Amino acid sequence: MSSAVARFDVQDPKELIRIITEVVIAHLEGGGAPVAAGSAPADVAALIDHTLLKPDATRADIERICHEAARYGFASVCVNPWYVPLAERLLRGSGVKVCTVVGFPLGATLPKIKLAEADQSLTLGAREIDMVLNMGALRSLEDDLVEAEIRAIAELCHRAGAICKVILETALLSQHEKVRAALIVKVAGADFVKTSTGVSAGGATLEDVALLRATVGPEMGIKASGGVRTLSQLHAMVSAGATRIGTSSGVKIMQELSGNTG
């Protein structure tokens, strides 16, 4: 965390984290300015990562979500690495990016394996990588390891012209751990911090999104994932600070927006 410490007159990284955490939580308790959530269909669609990460997803399922994503103009489709080549072929020229996951869903894969997984996915056509942070290392206070792993994948993504998002799995972390993790992700150079895998017991909450926004500031991306199934939930997450929504309910949300729920 030396790059973060250099910006403050604090020598101990743990003390730096403690100070920033207290400031962030105090800011959150005092309320913050909400982010406006537009309702134009193109604006809403551009927020959505159309997601299908179920282990039993078939080629037909992937074809369906790719066609849906192209029809509505979603930001990306998020699929397991096995389906990256198929999604890339189906979406080529559509403007919809292919997103995939690394170290999913536990985040406990060895760093070199995560890096290789990201590298091959990028080679196959992924342009957004959602990697899972090593929660065990984070909770064991091995911040240097966590930062190094994220930095390596973020730099790999950026060399390929791709985006790196880091999943925290907020449902498993304390408030202080969420803040610490988000700061590490920011210092490591990732583009987004993401709340959840959607596999664990809890998904995105408004409180967590607001906490992450207060932590990383106004410029960094925040992806809310897990449990966002309606237009009102999407707007609430954006108002709390999310700039991307991971959901398998993208079509339902767009139909709700147009008044067609049939």
Regions found by a protein language model. Give the residues of each.
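Protein-protein interaction and targeting regions used for scaffolding, dimerization, and localization
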Residues: 1-38
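Alpha/beta enzyme core
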Residues: 34-72, 82-222, 230-256, 260-262
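Short hydrophobic "strand-cap" motifs at the C-terminus of beta-strands
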Residues: 225
